[in-house]
UniProtKB/Swiss-Prot annotation:
It comes from Salmonella typhimurium (strain LT2 / SGSC1412 / ATCC 700720). The active site is at Y140. This is tRNA-acetylating toxin 1. TRNA binds at W29, K33, K36, N37, N75, R77, R78, N79, M80, P81, R91. The lineage of its organism: Bacteria, Pseudomonadati, Pseudomonadota, Gammaproteobacteria, Enterobacterales. Disruption phenotype: Both tacT1 and tacA1-tacT1 can be deleted without an effect on growth in cell culture; in a tacT1 deletion, transcription of tacA1 is increased 28.6-fold. It catalyses: glycyl-tRNA(Gly) + acetyl-CoA = N-acetylglycyl-tRNA(Gly) + CoA + H(+); L-lysyl-[protein] + acetyl-CoA = N(6)-acetyl-L-lysyl-[protein] + CoA + H(+).
Length: 161
């Protein structure tokens, strides 16, 4: 990741006030709810910071969830209960100053590896994401996610069994 720190759990020491990704809903969530959700255990948020600072350059957030068979792709439904257990990639955003530099892909890669490690210890079938925009949807498709049967911007990446 070079110009940023390794991913680490969000804490009160991280500076989020100046984070601007271009998606206000993601920026506001990080600034207003990120730490609260972390403390409550509702989601786990991981951040990367600009090198030698605590200023957040990007983040992603993971939570547990489930998806009904009707929304899942065919290969996820096979031999699975209804609903199917998943890990939700609830948010992923990169500060505008790092757009176009591969940081989003690096964060996604870290999130997927983290989810793989979780799947070795608990029963989850896939990573699920709700893309905010068509651009975000195309980003996830480019990285191997498959679209839902029924929800246009819901995508899945199957985890190994």
């Amino acid at each position: 990741m070079g110009r940023v720190t390794a991913p680490e759990p969000l804490s009160a020491f991280h500076q989020v006030a100046e984070f601007v990704s271009g998606e206000a809903v993601l920026d506001d969530w990080l600034k207003q709810k990120g730490l609260k959700n972390q403390a409550l255990g509702a989601a786990r948020t991981f951040v990367v910071c600009k090198k030698d600072t605590k200023q957040v350059a990007g983040f992603y957030s993971l939570a547990t969830g489930s998806v009904n068979h009707t929304e899942a792709t065919g290969n996820l439904r096979r031999n699975m209960p209804d609903p199917i257990p998943v890990i939700i990639l609830a948010r992923l955003a990169v500060d505008l100053s790092f757009h176009g530099k591969g940081l989003g892909a690096d964060l996604l890669h870290d999130a997927v590896l983290r989810c793989y490690r979780v799947a070795e210890n608990i029963g989850v079938r896939a990573i699920m994401v709700h893309a905010l925009t068509e651009e975000a949807k195309n980003f996830y498709i480019h990285h191997g996610f498959k679209s839902s049967q029924t929800q246009q911007r819901t995508l899945f990446l199957r985890l190994p069994q």
